[in-house]
């Protein structure tokens, strides 16, 4: 088999044109938001802390994750030939799996970092030292790419009956539906992978935020408590969207949604979440906005 045919999201021309503009705009926002975060953290020494180290890694993962899927989508929307070469499909599936799993694990590590900062502020720099931060980030990436390697190998070793994929990208469940043999083993592997890469970090997120809430309740200042709850709430919204859509797609009952519904959910966590992460995690952060103002003032002064 030399190529796969991707049916995409819709065959209506008017809808495809509007989606072409929408996806390009969202991808542009994703690129600008994440690159801006990387530049600000690099330029401002006040942001050289464990929290912003993890944000740097998350932004890099988001850039790569979005770039592995989104650029192909506008091209296919306006093209009559919606095909992708076999090895390009393999690389896309492998990369998206690895980066998605790495992102889930990173969100768990970031929640743990936040809980240490709130619960142990005096010992924060001692606990979250450079070696631990590097180890956590590297562990997230290694685990994500190892998981991707396993899933990719067992998926593409299956004999496929045809090459027409009812999806907008090469995605595990969509490719598995092309198999001519029983895929029960693959479904078990996907479920185990989902538990390890999604549910374990999600449990860590819930545990960490539980500790954060408990610590906040001991704050006597109503203003300080409200501010802390607002910050945690913003982070929790992004985490809930990211984990919620993935859990619905990979761990939910197969009868609960149609293939088209699955595509919409996959679109959400592949396109929307990487765009929202820099907005909610960073651009609403006062320290990041202060760094942005400082950089703009420097350019204004030079001008």
Model-flagged regions — what are they?
Residues 1-303:
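Transmembrane helical core of 7TM receptor-like proteins
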């Amino acid at each position: 088999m030399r190529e796969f045919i991707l049916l995409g999201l819709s065959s209506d021309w008017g809808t495809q044109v509007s989606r072409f503009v929408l996806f390009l705009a969202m991808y542009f926002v994703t690129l600008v938001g994440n690159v801006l975060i990387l530049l600000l953290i690099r330029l401002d020494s006040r942001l050289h802390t464990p929290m912003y180290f993890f944000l740097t890694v998350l932004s890099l993962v988001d850039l790569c994750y979005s770039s592995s899927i989104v650029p192909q989508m506008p091209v296919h929307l306006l093209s009559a030939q919606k095909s992708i070469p076999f090895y390009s499909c393999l690389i896309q599936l492998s990369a998206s799996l690895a980066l998605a799993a790495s992102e889930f694990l990173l969100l768990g590590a970031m929640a743990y970092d936040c809980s240490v900062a709130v619960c142990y502020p005096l010992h924060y720099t001692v606990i979250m030292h450079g070696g631990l931060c590097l180890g956590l980030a590297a562990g997230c990436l290694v685990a994500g790419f190892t998981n991707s390697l396993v899933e990719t190998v067992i998926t593409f070793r299956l004999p496929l009956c045809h090459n027409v994929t009812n999806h907008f990208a090469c995605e595990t469940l969509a490719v598995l539906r092309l198999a001519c043999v029983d895929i029960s083993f693959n479904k078990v592997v996907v479920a185990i992978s989902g538990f390890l890469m999604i549910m374990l970090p999600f449990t860590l997120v819930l545990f960490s935020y539980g500790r954060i809430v408990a610590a906040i309740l001991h704050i006597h200042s109503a203003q300080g408590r409200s501010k802390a709850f607002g910050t945690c709430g913003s982070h929790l919204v992004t985490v809930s969207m990211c984990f919620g859509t993935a859990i619905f797609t990979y761990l939910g009952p197969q009868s609960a949604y149609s293939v088209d519904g699955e595509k919409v959910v996959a679109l959400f966590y592949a396109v929307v979440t990487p765009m929202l992460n820099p907005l909610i995690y960073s651009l609403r952060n006062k320290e990041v906005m202060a760094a942005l103002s400082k950089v703009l003032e420097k350019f204004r002064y030079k001008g």
